Amino acid sequence: MNPPPLIRLQDVTVKIQGRTLIENVTFDINSGEIITVIGPNGAGKSTLAKALLGIQPLSRGEVLRRPGLKIGYMPQRFHIDASLPLTVKRFLQLAHNPQRWREALQRVEMEHVAKQPMHTLSGGELQRVLLARALQRAPDLLVLDEPAQGVDVTGQAELYRLIRSLRDELHCGALLVSHDLHLVMASTDQVLCLNRHICCAGHPEKVSNEPAFINLFGTQAARSLAVYHHHHDHHHHTDGTVAAGSECSHGDQHA
């Protein structure tokens, strides 16, 4: 018998002041599984992550969590005031399980920034430190909201390699949220395209089949990144209504 999923969303709907943010969203996340949620701005991706975490009240549906489930969360936005003398070490010591700060930094390959002020970190360094903080809970599930934000393509490939390695080491599940409609983590088991509801879902295709990409970014990036091709049976009007047909209105990003 297969173990129950780490988390199950059933017909999850969130409405705020009469506006539907997400509607009838249903999917499972299992141990060792990586799911990437993509979609345009305003599609409800962060709302979905908050609903999964239990910090966003539901209008309808339910979120079922495996008993004792531990979740490590990496937020989309994080700002440290430059006037605040907070080092990376101290930042991690303020988190859950502060004694694990050194182990967490080692896992994300960032021991060398332990004494560095938080506000001096580069975009890629900050993302890894936030990932280290999420790891301090020894999570069964990682929820990473825009983990590659502010990171170039080569940095994305390295970050995705690290996430894959952590998944293999910790045997945890992972939900990644991304605004990139096409370029996703190659190790993703399932891509969910969200625009209030799940428009389509499927497996990414490896970019190792794209010689131009390999020539530009190298074979390491090709192993970590993949292209997702959308297959929609409907499209969205600008007022949010849904109509039959494969035309897609995700915007210019979705070429």
Swiss-Prot record:
The keyword Hydrolase does not apply. Residues 7-220 form the ABC transporter domain. PROSITE patterns: ABC_TRANSPORTER_1 (PS00211), ABC_TRANSPORTER_2 (PS50893), ZNUC (PS51298). One of its GO terms (molecular function) is ATP binding. It catalyses: Zn(2+)(out) + ATP(in) + H2O(in) = Zn(2+)(in) + ADP(in) + phosphate(in) + H(+)(in). It holds the Pfam family ABC_tran. The keyword Transferase does not apply. This is Zinc import ATP-binding protein ZnuC 1. The gene is znuC1.
